[in-house]
Amino acid sequence: MGASVALTFLLLLATFRAGSGHDEVETRECIYYNANWELEKTNQSGVERLVEGKKDKRLHCYASWRNNSGFIELVKKGCWLDDFNCYDRQECIAKEENPQVFFCCCEGNYCNKKFTHLPEVETFDPKPQPSASVLNILIYSLLPIVGLSMAILLAFWMYRHRKPSYGHVEINEDPGLPPPSPLVGLKPLQLLDIKARGRFGCVWKARLLNEYVAVKIFPVQDKQSWQCEKEIFTTPGMKHENLLEFIAAEKRGSNLEMELWLITAFHDKGSLTDYLKGNLVSWNELCHITETMARGLAYLHEDVPRCKGEGHKPAIAHRDFKSKNVLLRNDLTAILADFGLAVRFEPGKPPGDTHGQVGTRRYMAPEVLEGAINFQRDSFLRIDMYAMGLVLWEIVSRCTAADGPVDEYLLPFEEEIGQHPSLEDLQEVVVHKKIRPVFKDHWLKHPGLAQLCVTIEECWDHDAEARLSAGCVEERISQIRKSVNGTTSDCLVSIVTSVTNVDLPPKESSI
C-alpha cells in the first residue's frame, strides 16, 4: 500500500514538472536531410532539434521533395517554426495538385519520417435533371436577362478600356499579376528579419528553399506604389546586371489585412549608404562602384526598340535616385533598386503620374525645388542626373586615394543644413545660393579624383540642359580609370593643371 502511494506521488510530481516545463519551452525533434549538404557545408542527414522559448510559438517538422516521372527526389527535411498550415497535423501530407516542389509539415517528434501526397479531391453531387418543360421555361425566361447583362458588361468593358492606362488604382481593382515565376507559391518561404524600412513599407530578408531573397511588403493603402513598381519590373528588357532582379509579386491576406509583396534578389551588403557609413573605398573600388552605377542608370534611361526578343523597352526615369536605393553585390557591383516612383515614357502613351515634387527632398534638383519642371522625358532624366552627381560626391568623400584625411560619412548638404532639412532650407541653399557639397583641396591633387570632380560638377549643373547623360558619365569614368591606372604610382602628377590636359568625352548630352 505504501509503495503504491509513493509511486502515485512520483508520477503526479513528474507530470507537474513536465507541464510547467512545457509552458516555458517547447522542444521538437525532426528527421533531418539536406540534398545540398556538400554545397551548404552541413550534415547530409540525422536528427534536428529545435527549442522555442515563447509559449505562443508552435514547432513543426517538414519535408520537401520532387517527383521526377515517378522517381521521388528528396530535397530537405527538418524543423519548421510556427506555421498555422501545420497545426494539429499528425502526418506529413502534401495536398497541392501538382507543384514543382512538394511540401508538407506536421506536429510531433519525427512525424516527417514518412511523407505522402494526397491531393484534395472535389466531390461531385449529381442532381436530378429537370424535365423538358421546366427546362424550356427557364431558357425562355433567362435568355433576355442574360443577353441584357452581357450587353451591359460589354459596354462597361469598352468604357474602362478607353480610359488612360495609368489612372488611380482603386482598392477593389485587381489589375492582375504578371505571369507567375516558377518560384511563386512554392514553400517554404520564410521571413527571417527586417533589413530596412522605407516610405512605402519594409524589406525583409527571407529564405525560399535553398536561397535567400528580399521581400518588400507594402501595406494595402500603398497599393499604387506596389502596382507601379511591379509594372516597372515586368516591363520588357528590365533584366540587366545593374538592375535589381525581380522574382515575383504576390498578394497575401484579404481586405484591410491584405499585404502586397514584391520578391526580389537579396544582396547581403545592403545599400550604398550603409556600406559607405562603415567602410572606406579604394581608388579601384570607387571606379567599379561608380562605373557600374552609371551603367545601370544609363540602361534604365535608354529606349531600346527590340530588347533581347522581349519587345520594346521604353526609357524610364527613376525619380528617387539616391545612395539608399543603390545596392551592392559582394564584388561591389552597383544594383539600382526601388522603382516605386519610376515612370515610363512609351510612344503614343501618357507617362502616368508625373507629379513634380516627388522623391527624397535632399536629392531634389533645383527645378524640382522651384516647381518649374518641363514635363517631358528629357527633363525627368536630367533630374536623375542631378541626384547622381550627389551620390558620386558621397562615394568620393569616402575614398582613400587622395593624400589626406577621410572624413566620417555625411549625406549631401548635411554639413550645410543638417540631417533633416526643410524644403525651404534646400530652396535657399540649392536654388537661390546655388551651393553644392564641397570638394576637399586634397581631392583635387589626385589626378583621378580631380577629373571625377569635374564630371560631378557637370552632373549637378544648375542648368538642367547642361547636365551630362548617364552614358557619358559611364564613359568618362572608364577613361579616367584607364588614364590613372595606366601610370605607375611614382609617375602620378598631383597638380590640378595636369588634369585639364586630359581629353574627356564631350559634354554633349545624349539625353
Swiss-Prot record:
Classification of source organism: Eukaryota, Metazoa, Chordata, Craniata, Vertebrata
Enzyme Commission number: 2.7.11.30
InterPro entries the record matches: Activin_recp (IPR000472), Kinase-like_dom_sf (IPR011009), Prot_kinase_dom (IPR000719), Ser/Thr_kinase_AS (IPR008271), Snake_toxin-like_sf (IPR045860), TGFB_receptor (IPR000333)
SUPFAM superfamilies, per the entry: Protein kinase-like (PK-like) (SSF56112), Snake toxin-like (SSF57302)
Family under the similarity heading: Belongs to the protein kinase superfamily. TKL Ser/Thr protein kinase family. TGFB receptor subfamily.
Binding site for ATP: 195-203, 216
Gene Ontology CC: one annotated term: activin receptor complex
Protein name as catalogued: Activin receptor type-2B
Main location, first listed in the record: membrane
EC class of the enzyme, as a word: transferase
Catalytic residues as annotated in Swiss-Prot or TrEMBL: 320 (proton acceptor)
Membrane topology, Cytoplasmic segments: 158-511
Naturally occurring in which organism (per UniProt): Xenopus laevis
Extracellular side: 21-136
Record-linked PANTHER family: ACTIVIN RECEPTOR TYPE-2B, TRANSFORMING GROWTH FACTOR-BETA RECEPTOR TYPE I AND II
Glycosylation-annotated residues: 43, 67
UniProt xrefs under Pfam families: Activin_recp, Pkinase
Signal peptide: 1-20
Record function comment: Receptor for activin A, activin B and inhibin A. Involved in transmembrane signaling.
Cellular compartment(s): Membrane
UniProt entry keywords in alphabetical sequence: ATP-binding, Disulfide bond, Glycoprotein, Kinase, Membrane, Nucleotide-binding, Receptor, Serine/threonine-protein kinase, Signal, Transferase, Transmembrane, Transmembrane helix
Catalytic reaction list: L-threonyl-[receptor-protein] + ATP = O-phospho-L-threonyl-[receptor-protein] + ADP + H(+); L-seryl-[receptor-protein] + ATP = O-phospho-L-seryl-[receptor-protein] + ADP + H(+)
Membrane-topology descriptor: Single-pass type I membrane protein
Underlying gene: acvr2b
